[in-house]
Amino acid sequence: TDLEDAFAVSTVVGGEIVDQQTAKTVEELSANDWVAWSGTGALAATVGKALSGGADGSPASADYTDFLAAIEPYKFDVLIYDGTDTTVQDAMVAFVKRLAAEEGAYTQLVAAGLTNPDDRFVVNIMSGVVLSDGTTLTPQQVTWWAGGALAGAQYNESLTYAAYPNAVDVSPKLTNSGYIDALTAGQFVLFADGGVVKVEQDINSLVTYTTDITGPYHKNRVIRLLNTIANDIYQQFSDGYIGVVNNNEQGRMMFKSAIVGYLLDIQANNGIQNFEAEDVTVEPGEAIDAIVVNLAIQPVDSVEKIYVTITVN
Protein backbone atom coordinates (compact mmCIF):
# COMPACT_ATOMS: atom_id res chain seq x y z
CA THR A 1 0.00 0.00 0.00
CA ASP A 2 0.93 3.67 -0.21
CA LEU A 3 0.67 3.97 3.57
CA GLU A 4 3.59 2.61 5.56
CA ASP A 5 2.63 -0.31 7.84
CA ALA A 6 -0.92 -0.35 6.40
CA PHE A 7 -2.63 -3.34 4.79
CA ALA A 8 -5.09 -3.77 1.95
CA VAL A 9 -7.98 -5.74 3.45
CA SER A 10 -10.17 -7.38 0.82
CA THR A 11 -13.48 -9.19 1.21
CA VAL A 12 -13.76 -11.86 -1.49
CA VAL A 13 -17.05 -13.60 -2.33
CA GLY A 14 -17.25 -16.22 -5.05
CA GLY A 15 -13.79 -15.28 -6.29
CA GLU A 16 -14.65 -11.58 -6.68
CA ILE A 17 -13.50 -8.70 -4.49
CA VAL A 18 -16.68 -7.09 -3.14
CA ASP A 19 -15.00 -4.68 -0.71
CA GLN A 20 -11.47 -3.38 -0.20
CA GLN A 21 -10.09 -1.07 2.48
CA THR A 22 -6.72 0.20 3.62
CA ALA A 23 -6.07 0.18 7.36
CA LYS A 24 -3.42 -0.31 10.04
CA THR A 25 -5.67 -1.37 12.92
CA VAL A 26 -8.93 -3.26 13.34
CA GLU A 27 -10.59 -0.10 14.60
CA GLU A 28 -9.97 1.59 11.24
CA LEU A 29 -11.96 -1.04 9.33
CA SER A 30 -15.56 -0.24 8.38
CA ALA A 31 -18.29 -2.88 8.24
CA ASN A 32 -19.51 -3.77 4.75
CA ASP A 33 -22.43 -5.78 3.39
CA TRP A 34 -20.60 -9.02 4.17
CA VAL A 35 -18.44 -8.56 7.26
CA ALA A 36 -18.77 -6.79 10.61
CA TRP A 37 -15.27 -6.43 12.06
CA SER A 38 -14.47 -7.00 15.72
CA GLY A 39 -11.36 -6.91 17.88
CA THR A 40 -8.68 -4.32 18.53
CA GLY A 41 -5.07 -3.65 17.75
CA ALA A 42 -2.73 -3.74 14.79
CA LEU A 43 -3.44 -5.81 11.71
CA ALA A 44 -1.16 -8.67 10.70
CA ALA A 45 -0.42 -9.97 7.22
CA THR A 46 -2.38 -13.03 6.05
CA VAL A 47 -2.85 -14.77 2.72
CA GLY A 48 -6.57 -15.08 3.43
CA LYS A 49 -8.97 -16.54 5.95
CA ALA A 50 -12.22 -18.33 5.11
CA LEU A 51 -15.15 -16.95 7.08
CA SER A 52 -18.15 -18.92 8.27
CA GLY A 53 -21.24 -18.52 10.42
CA GLY A 54 -22.73 -15.64 8.49
CA ALA A 55 -26.45 -15.21 7.83
CA ASP A 56 -28.25 -13.67 4.88
CA GLY A 57 -30.78 -11.88 7.04
CA SER A 58 -34.34 -11.08 6.04
CA PRO A 59 -35.11 -8.18 3.70
CA ALA A 60 -37.61 -5.62 4.92
CA SER A 61 -40.23 -3.85 2.81
CA ALA A 62 -37.95 -0.83 2.61
CA ASP A 63 -35.27 -2.98 0.98
CA TYR A 64 -37.68 -3.88 -1.83
CA THR A 65 -38.62 -0.23 -2.21
CA ASP A 66 -34.94 0.65 -2.60
CA PHE A 67 -34.50 -2.22 -5.07
CA LEU A 68 -37.35 -1.03 -7.29
CA ALA A 69 -35.97 2.50 -7.26
CA ALA A 70 -32.53 1.17 -8.23
CA ILE A 71 -33.73 -0.92 -11.20
CA GLU A 72 -36.22 1.58 -12.63
CA PRO A 73 -33.72 3.33 -14.94
CA TYR A 74 -32.84 0.02 -16.62
CA LYS A 75 -34.65 -1.94 -19.33
CA PHE A 76 -35.77 -5.46 -18.46
CA ASP A 77 -38.42 -7.86 -19.71
CA VAL A 78 -39.32 -9.66 -16.48
CA LEU A 79 -39.29 -8.87 -12.77
CA ILE A 80 -39.48 -11.87 -10.40
CA TYR A 81 -40.73 -11.82 -6.81
CA ASP A 82 -40.47 -15.19 -5.06
CA GLY A 83 -41.88 -14.16 -1.68
CA THR A 84 -45.26 -14.15 0.03
CA ASP A 85 -45.35 -10.70 1.65
CA THR A 86 -48.58 -9.14 0.39
CA THR A 87 -47.26 -5.62 0.94
CA VAL A 88 -44.29 -6.34 -1.32
CA GLN A 89 -46.54 -8.10 -3.84
CA ASP A 90 -48.80 -5.06 -4.06
CA ALA A 91 -45.77 -2.78 -4.46
CA MET A 92 -44.39 -4.93 -7.28
CA VAL A 93 -47.73 -5.00 -9.10
CA ALA A 94 -48.11 -1.23 -8.77
CA PHE A 95 -44.52 -0.79 -10.00
CA VAL A 96 -44.94 -2.63 -13.33
CA LYS A 97 -48.31 -0.98 -13.92
CA ARG A 98 -46.80 2.47 -13.37
CA LEU A 99 -43.84 1.75 -15.64
CA ALA A 100 -46.22 0.88 -18.47
CA ALA A 101 -48.70 3.70 -17.90
CA GLU A 102 -46.32 6.56 -17.09
CA GLU A 103 -42.89 5.63 -18.42
CA GLY A 104 -43.73 3.61 -21.52
CA ALA A 105 -41.51 0.84 -20.17
CA TYR A 106 -43.16 -2.54 -20.64
CA THR A 107 -42.22 -5.44 -18.40
CA GLN A 108 -44.00 -8.31 -16.68
CA LEU A 109 -44.00 -9.25 -13.01
CA VAL A 110 -43.80 -12.98 -12.28
CA ALA A 111 -44.97 -13.89 -8.77
CA ALA A 112 -47.02 -16.56 -7.00
CA GLY A 113 -50.06 -16.50 -4.76
CA LEU A 114 -51.29 -13.07 -5.82
CA THR A 115 -54.91 -12.17 -5.12
CA ASN A 116 -56.64 -11.45 -8.43
CA PRO A 117 -54.07 -9.07 -9.98
CA ASP A 118 -56.08 -9.05 -13.25
CA ASP A 119 -53.41 -7.34 -15.36
CA ARG A 120 -51.58 -8.19 -18.57
CA PHE A 121 -48.29 -7.16 -17.02
CA VAL A 122 -48.59 -9.65 -14.13
CA VAL A 123 -48.10 -13.44 -14.38
CA ASN A 124 -49.53 -15.27 -11.36
CA ILE A 125 -47.92 -18.69 -10.79
CA MET A 126 -50.17 -21.31 -9.18
CA SER A 127 -48.27 -24.60 -9.48
CA GLY A 128 -45.34 -26.10 -7.65
CA VAL A 129 -43.35 -29.01 -9.08
CA VAL A 130 -41.68 -32.23 -7.95
CA LEU A 131 -38.21 -32.73 -9.42
CA SER A 132 -36.72 -36.06 -10.50
CA ASP A 133 -34.65 -36.24 -7.29
CA GLY A 134 -37.78 -35.90 -5.14
CA THR A 135 -37.32 -32.22 -4.30
CA THR A 136 -40.59 -30.29 -4.17
CA LEU A 137 -40.54 -26.67 -5.29
CA THR A 138 -43.24 -24.27 -4.17
CA PRO A 139 -45.06 -21.99 -6.61
CA GLN A 140 -42.83 -19.19 -5.30
CA GLN A 141 -39.74 -21.19 -6.28
CA VAL A 142 -41.26 -22.01 -9.67
CA THR A 143 -41.19 -18.27 -10.41
CA TRP A 144 -37.44 -18.65 -10.98
CA TRP A 145 -37.86 -20.94 -13.99
CA ALA A 146 -41.08 -19.33 -15.22
CA GLY A 147 -39.58 -15.85 -15.12
CA GLY A 148 -36.48 -16.97 -16.99
CA ALA A 149 -38.55 -18.83 -19.58
CA LEU A 150 -40.82 -15.85 -20.13
CA ALA A 151 -37.87 -13.49 -20.46
CA GLY A 152 -36.14 -15.82 -22.91
CA ALA A 153 -39.15 -16.47 -25.13
CA GLN A 154 -39.26 -14.56 -28.42
CA TYR A 155 -42.21 -12.54 -29.71
CA ASN A 156 -43.06 -15.36 -32.13
CA GLU A 157 -42.92 -18.13 -29.52
CA SER A 158 -45.38 -19.47 -26.95
CA LEU A 159 -44.60 -21.32 -23.72
CA THR A 160 -47.81 -23.33 -23.93
CA TYR A 161 -46.78 -26.97 -23.38
CA ALA A 162 -43.19 -25.94 -22.70
CA ALA A 163 -41.49 -28.54 -20.48
CA TYR A 164 -40.13 -27.73 -17.02
CA PRO A 165 -36.59 -29.19 -16.88
CA ASN A 166 -36.14 -32.24 -14.60
CA ALA A 167 -39.69 -32.01 -13.21
CA VAL A 168 -41.79 -35.19 -13.05
CA ASP A 169 -44.94 -34.09 -11.23
CA VAL A 170 -46.88 -31.04 -10.06
CA SER A 171 -47.96 -29.89 -6.63
CA PRO A 172 -50.81 -29.46 -5.99
CA LYS A 173 -52.52 -31.78 -8.44
CA LEU A 174 -55.71 -30.47 -10.03
CA THR A 175 -58.74 -32.08 -11.59
CA ASN A 176 -59.80 -31.08 -15.09
CA SER A 177 -62.36 -28.67 -13.65
CA GLY A 178 -59.65 -27.33 -11.34
CA TYR A 179 -57.46 -26.50 -14.33
CA ILE A 180 -60.37 -24.80 -16.07
CA ASP A 181 -61.10 -22.72 -12.96
CA ALA A 182 -57.43 -21.76 -12.58
CA LEU A 183 -57.09 -20.69 -16.20
CA THR A 184 -60.34 -18.77 -16.03
CA ALA A 185 -58.94 -16.95 -12.98
CA GLY A 186 -55.83 -15.97 -14.94
CA GLN A 187 -53.38 -18.30 -13.20
CA PHE A 188 -50.25 -19.76 -14.78
CA VAL A 189 -50.51 -23.50 -14.14
CA LEU A 190 -48.44 -26.59 -14.90
CA PHE A 191 -49.56 -30.16 -15.49
CA ALA A 192 -47.87 -33.58 -15.51
CA ASP A 193 -48.00 -35.61 -18.72
CA GLY A 194 -46.31 -39.02 -18.63
CA GLY A 195 -43.63 -37.93 -16.18
CA VAL A 196 -43.03 -34.61 -17.94
CA VAL A 197 -44.28 -31.33 -16.48
CA LYS A 198 -45.55 -28.76 -18.97
CA VAL A 199 -47.11 -25.30 -19.02
CA GLU A 200 -50.87 -25.62 -19.48
CA GLN A 201 -51.23 -22.25 -21.19
CA ASP A 202 -48.90 -19.26 -21.61
CA ILE A 203 -51.19 -16.62 -20.11
CA ASN A 204 -51.04 -13.65 -17.79
CA SER A 205 -53.50 -12.67 -15.07
CA LEU A 206 -55.74 -10.43 -17.20
CA VAL A 207 -59.35 -11.66 -16.98
CA THR A 208 -61.39 -8.44 -17.24
CA TYR A 209 -61.59 -7.14 -20.79
CA THR A 210 -62.55 -3.73 -22.13
CA THR A 211 -63.13 -2.24 -25.56
CA ASP A 212 -59.43 -1.42 -25.81
CA ILE A 213 -57.93 -4.31 -23.82
CA THR A 214 -59.52 -7.42 -25.31
CA GLY A 215 -59.04 -11.18 -25.05
CA PRO A 216 -55.77 -11.46 -27.03
CA TYR A 217 -54.02 -9.37 -24.34
CA HIS A 218 -54.49 -12.38 -22.04
CA LYS A 219 -51.86 -14.30 -24.03
CA ASN A 220 -48.22 -13.75 -23.15
CA ARG A 221 -47.10 -14.30 -26.74
CA VAL A 222 -49.20 -11.30 -27.77
CA ILE A 223 -47.83 -9.22 -24.89
CA ARG A 224 -44.26 -10.11 -25.86
CA LEU A 225 -44.99 -9.02 -29.42
CA LEU A 226 -46.53 -5.70 -28.40
CA ASN A 227 -43.78 -4.98 -25.89
CA THR A 228 -41.12 -5.78 -28.49
CA ILE A 229 -42.68 -3.50 -31.10
CA ALA A 230 -43.17 -0.62 -28.66
CA ASN A 231 -39.63 -0.87 -27.28
CA ASP A 232 -37.99 -1.33 -30.70
CA ILE A 233 -39.81 1.58 -32.33
CA TYR A 234 -38.93 3.84 -29.41
CA GLN A 235 -35.28 2.78 -29.67
CA GLN A 236 -35.27 3.34 -33.42
CA PHE A 237 -36.80 6.80 -32.96
CA SER A 238 -34.35 7.64 -30.20
CA ASP A 239 -31.27 6.45 -32.09
CA GLY A 240 -31.92 7.85 -35.54
CA TYR A 241 -34.62 10.51 -35.54
CA ILE A 242 -34.78 12.63 -32.38
CA GLY A 243 -32.99 15.89 -33.04
CA VAL A 244 -31.95 14.72 -36.52
CA VAL A 245 -35.00 14.49 -38.80
CA ASN A 246 -37.19 17.47 -39.65
CA ASN A 247 -40.79 17.36 -38.45
CA ASN A 248 -42.27 17.92 -41.90
CA GLU A 249 -43.98 15.65 -44.41
CA GLN A 250 -40.69 14.31 -45.72
CA GLY A 251 -39.30 13.61 -42.26
CA ARG A 252 -42.46 11.86 -41.13
CA MET A 253 -42.49 9.74 -44.28
CA MET A 254 -38.93 8.67 -43.53
CA PHE A 255 -39.96 7.48 -40.09
CA LYS A 256 -43.04 5.73 -41.49
CA SER A 257 -40.91 3.92 -44.05
CA ALA A 258 -38.60 2.70 -41.29
CA ILE A 259 -41.56 1.44 -39.23
CA VAL A 260 -43.12 -0.30 -42.23
CA GLY A 261 -39.84 -2.05 -43.00
CA TYR A 262 -39.50 -3.14 -39.39
CA LEU A 263 -43.06 -4.52 -39.25
CA LEU A 264 -42.57 -6.39 -42.51
CA ASP A 265 -39.63 -8.14 -40.84
CA ILE A 266 -41.86 -8.96 -37.86
CA GLN A 267 -44.44 -10.38 -40.27
CA ALA A 268 -41.80 -12.46 -42.07
CA ASN A 269 -40.93 -13.98 -38.68
CA ASN A 270 -44.59 -14.87 -37.98
CA GLY A 271 -45.14 -12.20 -35.36
CA ILE A 272 -48.00 -10.48 -37.21
CA GLN A 273 -50.11 -11.20 -40.28
CA ASN A 274 -52.07 -9.38 -43.00
CA PHE A 275 -49.97 -6.24 -42.52
CA GLU A 276 -49.87 -3.51 -45.18
CA ALA A 277 -48.04 -0.20 -45.32
CA GLU A 278 -51.36 1.65 -45.03
CA ASP A 279 -51.70 0.24 -41.50
CA VAL A 280 -49.12 2.79 -40.32
CA THR A 281 -49.69 6.54 -40.08
CA VAL A 282 -47.26 9.16 -38.80
CA GLU A 283 -48.96 12.49 -38.21
CA PRO A 284 -47.84 15.83 -36.75
CA GLY A 285 -48.56 16.24 -33.05
CA GLU A 286 -49.96 19.26 -31.26
CA ALA A 287 -46.50 20.62 -30.45
CA ILE A 288 -44.21 21.79 -33.23
CA ASP A 289 -41.65 19.10 -32.36
CA ALA A 290 -44.10 16.20 -31.87
CA ILE A 291 -45.32 13.38 -34.06
CA VAL A 292 -48.07 10.80 -33.50
CA VAL A 293 -47.64 7.21 -34.72
CA ASN A 294 -50.65 4.92 -35.18
CA LEU A 295 -50.24 1.22 -35.93
CA ALA A 296 -52.84 -1.40 -36.80
CA ILE A 297 -51.47 -4.92 -36.45
CA GLN A 298 -52.89 -8.43 -36.22
CA PRO A 299 -50.79 -10.66 -33.92
CA VAL A 300 -50.17 -14.30 -34.76
CA ASP A 301 -50.85 -16.76 -31.93
CA SER A 302 -49.85 -20.40 -31.59
CA VAL A 303 -52.29 -23.25 -32.19
CA GLU A 304 -53.68 -24.34 -28.81
CA LYS A 305 -57.13 -25.71 -29.62
CA ILE A 306 -57.87 -28.31 -32.28
CA TYR A 307 -61.48 -29.12 -33.17
CA VAL A 308 -62.01 -32.26 -35.23
CA THR A 309 -65.24 -33.04 -37.05
CA ILE A 310 -65.67 -36.64 -38.17
CA THR A 311 -68.41 -37.52 -40.64
CA VAL A 312 -69.39 -41.18 -40.87
CA ASN A 313 -70.89 -42.24 -44.19
Residue ranges and their predicted role:
Residues 1-313:
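Surface-exposed assembly/interface segments
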